[in-house]
Structure formats: structure tokens, C-alpha cells
């Protein structure tokens, strides 16, 4: 089976925060899981280096957009590597390859009659002497009357045109813009109305899109899909490949999602492999992002793919809700966020991955609290999983000289483990990652209870054979926990596998166990609860 996984492209205009990771982490869990099943996986993403936020920040700081993009693209790569993300291709939208691919898609849509020219009115700043596309305009949403940008309202998810806003202001200088006529290219989105309607109906029947994606897309379809501009007067971006229009750029909403396609093509060129299998109707596709990106993946990207004759429209849309911090909405402008480079300096990446999975905003907004994060690490990772692994392996090291006693696996435990692979695998494929991880940790708690009830410290003297059976079965559980947890907790899983000298990582029960263990070290370290107060003080102290 061919599995395509696309992770949303973060804007390279500032550091990643935990809200980004909460929405993107499911992609890596899926990629690791499907690879362990032996499926053909292509997992791609990249840094959005053409967006308006980058141009605005560059102008504000008096540097080039490329300098800003370079800085954060490199930082993103370091963060994703440190968190264990296993992208097959992580690229950037200001690359020559991406520009060429996007221009080819634009020309194909133009040739097929899906793009046309139109004279329109657009916001123009007399002070800055330039047209103001999308995020260059801020104001009040006409639908919910909350603060909004010119391209979209985060409060109600409405897709907007800058002229829709009430109380419009230029993002650069704060002036009230005027309105002037200009010519732009438009995408005939309305012609895909029935196909998008059918796609959301299928998703609703099969449960392959998150509820928020279904509800929002149904709303767009009910209101009727409107044609959207595909060109803008922007300082950076992909130039329109039409003579006489080279000074205009392809609008980021169509250019950025085409990054999935350009990354796929780039991967094919780099590896010499054929990527077409990931774009036919048999491919299983997952798109992983936050709810603010829903319309771009449930409406616009499917329409673009259909327009160029590709069949692999998004089958699974994994659109998480928002993550708050200490019960307050994340705000990068106010510095109310937990920044990824910062948290990685002090905490185990598996602790971050664990918390953002069991506390994932899968169907509703959830909160990151330092208290819950640290107590979660100490009680679940250290107290449950780490405790079971260490008490078992230390027992072997102390009483058997590191030699694993060879006995038989209990039928009940074997059935339980086989059931775990089945149920956890099904939950992952259905994008129920929290359920999947909680199912494994239920088994971890069962394993601790098993150890306590068997009392090997007593069996060793009263019934040595039973003691060996207990320990052998505990090693069996540990080997399989490391395997089952690999998509979620790759770093600790690798440490366990190294201790047990296990190389095989297929998604199936590990029945062949090691004959000996080496260098047993604690799987996790306890975090001092005094850190809670320190982290909260640091968070409040950084607020602007």
C-alpha cells in the first residue's frame, strides 16, 4: 500500500511553539507506524518561506526576507530532528524546484480552463504606495466581529478577502487603505462544487476526516464555493509564469499547498524513485494540520488536484483543534507560548511527544499546563513505564548476572499482546492517537500489577522456576512495549531495544527474546516538581 503523509508547512517567520507540534506530531506517528508495517511511505513537509508574515517581519527588522527564512528554516529542521520527526523530504517554498513545480501547476490549471483573468478592486496603501494583499490588511471580521487578518478569521474560520474586513488597517503603517482597481487571475473553484460535496459526504460516511473538517467544509459547500484569486501583488513568492504578469505572484493559498506536490517531486528526483503511486486513486493519503488550515486542505487542495488530473485527493484530514497554555490562548505577539527550542533544552523529547499525544486537541481545544506536563512525566513515563522496565531488567542484572532466563510465554499474555497490536494499529489508522497510546499504557499498568502479584523477589527463593517464568514474561512484555511505543516514544523505545539487543521493528509481536541484557540504565529521570513554579514564573515573566 502507498501511504502519503503531508504535514502542514510552518511559516518561517518565528520559532515553533507547542501548538505547532501538537498539530504536526500525528504525521510522524503515522509515518513510523506504517513503515513498521512494511508499507511504502512518503512523509513530506517544509518551511513556508514565501508567506506575507515573512515579508512583513523582514521589512520591520530591516533585513531581507531570505535572511528571515534561512534563520527559521534551519531552526525548524533542528527542532524536528530533536523531536524525532522522520520526514522523507523536508524542503522550503523559496527553492527553485518548488517555484518550477508551482508554475507548472498554475499553467496546467490555466490550460484546462480553471484559471481566468478578472479586473478587481483591492486595498491600496497610499502611505506605503503598494497594494495590500491578504495579511497586509488587518481589521474586524464581518461575520463574527472578532479581530481578523485579510485572508482568514481565526475566530470563526471564515475565508476572507481583505476588502471584507471592517475597520481596515495597513499592517505595515497602520493607515486606512483606499480601494483601487487591478487585474488578477482567478481559480474557478465553483466548478468543483459537486466533487467537493461528494468528497465530504464520503468522509462523513467513513469517518476519515475530523468532525471539524466535515462541519466546516459542509458549511462552505452549502454556501456555495466561490472563485478565489490566485495572484497577488506581493514582494516575494512564485512569479506568475505568464508574459506581462511576471511582477505578480501566485497567491500563497494555492502555492503553499502545492508544496506537498513539489516536495513529492523533489523526493523522486533526489532518490531516483517514482512518486506517481502516491498520487493515484489507490493511495492512502493523510494531511496533518491545525483547524485554521482546514479549508486549504478540504476544499482548495482537492480542487487543485482534480484540476490537474491527479486522483489522490485528501482521504484522511487530521485537523486538530487548538492548544492553549495555562488556560490562555496562545499568542506569539504577546509571547504567551511555550517555544520548542526552549523546552527541548531541558526536557526529554519523548516527554513532550507523550504529553502532546495523550493531551492532544483531537476533537476539542486542550491545555498545556506545566503542572500536568511534569506530573504526567513522573507518574506515567517514569512511574509506570520506566518503573516496569527498570525493575525487571535490574532484577535480571542483580540475580541472573544479566542472563535472561529461558522459559515459555504465557498464553494469556501472548493473546493480550497480539490484541494490543491489532487494537493500537486500528486506532492509529483511524487517527485516534490518544486512544492508541492510552491502550498501551493500560497494558503497562497491567504489567506492573502482574509483576507485583507474581512477587518474583519471593519466587526466587520459594519457587525459582516460577520466578524465571515471571521474569521471562516480563521481558516479553518490555520488548513488545518498546515496539508498540516506537511511533509515539521513539527515543526511549530505542534505548530499550539497545538494552535488549533487538533490531527487528516490524508491527508484530516480538516472540524472539534476548539471551542477555547489557548496561541497564534508568529509562527516564524524575523531574523535580519545583520546576513547575520556575516554568510558570518564566512564562509570565516573558509576556509582552
Curated annotation (Swiss-Prot):
Cofactor note: Binds 1 zinc ion per subunit.
Annotated GO CC locations: cytosol
Residue ranges annotated as motif 'HIGH' region: 10-20
Keywords on record: Aminoacyl-tRNA synthetase, ATP-binding, Cytoplasm, Ligase, Metal-binding, Nucleotide-binding, Protein biosynthesis, Zinc
EC number: 6.1.1.10
Pfam families assigned: Anticodon_3, tRNA-synt_1g
GO molecular function, one term: ATP binding
Cofactor(s) the protein requires to work: Zn(2+)
Record: residues binding ATP: 332
Protein name, entry field: Methionine--tRNA ligase 2
Record organism: Bacillus cereus (strain ATCC 14579 / DSM 31 / CCUG 7414 / JCM 2152 / NBRC 15305 / NCIMB 9373 / NCTC 2599 / NRRL B-3711)
Gene coding for it: metG2
Amino acid at each position: 500500500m502507498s501511504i502519503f503523509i503531508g504535514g502542514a508547512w510552518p511559516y518561517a517567520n518565528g520559532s515553533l511553539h507547542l501548538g505547532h507540534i501538537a498539530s504536526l506530531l500525528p504525521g510522524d506517528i503515522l509515518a513510523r507506524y506504517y513503515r513498521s508495517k512494511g508499507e511504502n511511505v512518503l512523509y513530506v513537509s517544509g518551511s513556508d518561506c514565501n508567506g506575507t508574515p515573512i515579508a512583513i517581519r523582514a521589512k520591520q527588522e530591516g533585513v531581507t526576507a531570505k535572511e528571515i527564512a534561512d534563520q527559521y528554516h534551519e531552526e525548524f529542521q533542528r527542532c524536528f530532528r530533536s523531536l524525532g520527526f522522520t520526514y522523507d523530504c523536508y524542503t522550503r517554498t523559496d527553492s527553485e524546484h518548488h517555484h518550477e513545480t508551482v508554475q507548472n501547476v498554475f499553467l496546467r490549471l490555466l490550460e484546462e480552463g480553471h484559471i481566468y483573468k478578472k479586473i478587481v478592486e483591492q486595498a491600496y496603501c497610499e502611505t506605503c504606495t503598494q497594494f495590500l494583499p491578504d495579511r497586509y490588511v488587518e481589521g474586524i471580521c464581518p461575520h463574527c466581529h472578532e479581530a481578523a487578518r485579510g485572508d482568514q478569521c481565526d475566530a470563526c474560520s471564515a475565508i476572507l478577502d481583505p476588502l471584507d474586513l471592517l475597520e481596515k488597517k495597513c499592517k505595515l503603517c497602520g493607515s486606512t487603505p483606499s480601494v483601487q482597481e487591478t487585474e488578477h487571475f482567478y481559480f474557478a473553484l465553483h466548478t468543483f462544487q459537486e466533487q467537493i460535496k461528494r468528497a465530504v459526504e464520503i468522509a462523513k460516511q467513513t469517518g476519515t476526516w475530523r468532525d471539524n473538517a466535515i462541519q466546516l467544509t459542509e458549511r462552505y459547500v452549502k454556501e456555495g464555493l466561490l472563485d478565489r484569486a490566485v495572484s497577488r501583488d506581493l514582494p516575494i513568492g512564485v512569479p506568475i509564469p505568464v508574459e506581462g504578469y511576471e511582477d505578480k505572484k501566485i497567491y500563497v493559498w494555492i502555492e503553499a499547498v502545492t508544496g506537498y506536490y513539489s516536495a513529492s517531486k523533489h523526493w523522486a528526483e533526489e532518490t531516483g524513485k517514482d512518486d506517481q503511486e502516491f498520487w493515484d486513486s489507490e493511495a492512502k493519503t493523510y494531511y496533518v494540520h491545525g483547524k485554521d488550515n482546514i479549508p486549504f486542505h478540504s476544499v482548495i487542495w482537492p480542487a487543485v488536484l482534480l484540476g490537474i488530473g491527479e486522483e489522490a485527493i485528501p482521504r484522511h484530514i487530521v485537523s486538530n483543534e487548538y492548544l492553549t497554555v495555562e488556560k490562555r490562548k496562545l499568542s506569539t505577539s504577546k509571547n504567551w507560548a511555550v517555544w520548542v527550542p526552549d523546552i527541548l533544552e531541558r526536557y526529554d523529547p519523548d516527554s513532550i511527544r507523550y504529553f502532546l499525544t495523550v493531551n492532544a486537541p483531537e476533537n476539542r481545544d486542550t491545555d498545556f499546563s506545566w503542572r500536568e506536563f511534569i506530573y504526567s512525566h513522573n507518574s506515567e513515563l517514569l512511574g509506570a513505564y520506566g518503573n516496569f522496565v527498570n525493575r525487571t531488567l535490574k532484577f535480571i542484572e542483580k540475580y541472573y548476572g544479566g542472563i535472561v532466563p529461558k522459559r515459555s510465554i504465557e498464553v494469556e499474555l501472548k493473546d493480550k499482546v497480539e490484541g494490543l497490536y491489532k487494537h493500537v494499529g486500528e486506532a492509529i489508522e483511524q487517527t485516534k492517537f490518544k486512544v492508541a497510546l492510552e491502550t498501551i499504557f493500560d497494558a503497562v499498568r497491567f504489567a506492573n500489577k502482574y509483576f507485583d502479584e507474581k512477587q518474583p523477589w519471593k519466587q526466587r527463593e520459594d519457587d525459582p522456576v516460577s520466578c524465571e517464568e515471571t521474569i521471562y514474561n516480563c521481558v516479553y512484555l518490555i520488548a513488545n512495549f518498546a515496539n508498540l511505543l516506537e511511533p509515539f516514544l521513539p527515543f526511549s523505545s530505542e534505548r530499550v531495544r539497545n538494552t535488549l539487543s533487538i533490531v527487528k521493528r516490524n508491527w508484530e509481536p516480538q516472540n524472539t527474546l534476548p539471551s542477555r541484557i547489557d548496561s541497564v540504565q534508568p529509562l527516564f529521570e524524575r523531574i523535580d516538581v519545583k520546576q513547575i513554579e520556575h516554568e510558570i514564573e518564566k512564562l509570565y515573566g516573558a509576556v509582552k
